Curated annotation (Swiss-Prot):
Name of the gene encoding the protein in the UniProt record: ftrB
Function: Catalytic subunit of the ferredoxin-thioredoxin reductase (FTR), which catalyzes the two-electron reduction of thioredoxins by the electrons provided by reduced ferredoxin.
Protein name as it appears in the record: Ferredoxin-thioredoxin reductase, catalytic chain
Cysteines paired by S-S bonds: 59-89
Subcellular location: Plastid, Chloroplast
Annotated cofactor note: Binds 1 [4Fe-4S] cluster.
Site (Increases the nucleophilicity of the active site Cys) location in chain: 88
Cellular component terms per the entry's GO annotation: chloroplast
Signal peptide: none
Subunit relationships: Heterodimer of subunit A (variable subunit) and subunit B (catalytic subunit). Heterodimeric FTR forms a complex with ferredoxin and thioredoxin.
Binding-site residues for [4Fe-4S] cluster, renumbered to this chain: 57, 76, 78, 87
Pfam families, A to Z: FeThRed_B (PF02943)
Length: 118
């Protein structure tokens, strides 16, 4: 059973990595200059997707995560991101943000290395 959960998390991690890259390109946003921030946020999204079935924003505190997921407001991409390009997690940054990089991709190896070292 643990092996199945690890496979599921690995699949969700890759899905969230690909989603993040695609969404950044589609919205003209970029990842943080510190790619460990990008990695930790993608990991958090994958963990929530693995545990709850939805990529709930990992950067906020929730009294009831299941209720928040049902409300969908903080499911990534959250409403503030979709409406105003405001990402609380700093996963998707606008070009004028002082912490932005020119990157819209993070390779799988870098992602795994940054997660392992966090």
């Amino acid at each position: 059973m643990k092996k199945q959960n690890l496979v599921s998390f690995s699949d969700n991690l890759e899905a969230m990595r690909k989603f993040s890259e695609t969404y950044a390109k589609r919205t003209g946003t970029f990842f943080c200059a510190d790619n460990s921030v990008t990695a930790v946020v993608i990991e958090g999204l994958a963990r929530h997707k693995d545990k709850y079935g939805a990529p709930l924003c990992p950067c906020r505190h929730y009294e009831d995560k299941k209720a928040e997921i049902s409300a969908t407001y903080w499911n990534c991409p959250c409403v503030p991101m979709r409406e105003r390009k405001e990402c609380h997690c700093m996963l998707f940054l606008t070009p004028d943000n002082e912490f932005t990089s020119d990157l819209q991709e993070i390779d799988k190896t870098t992602l795994l290395e940054k997660i392992a070292s966090s």
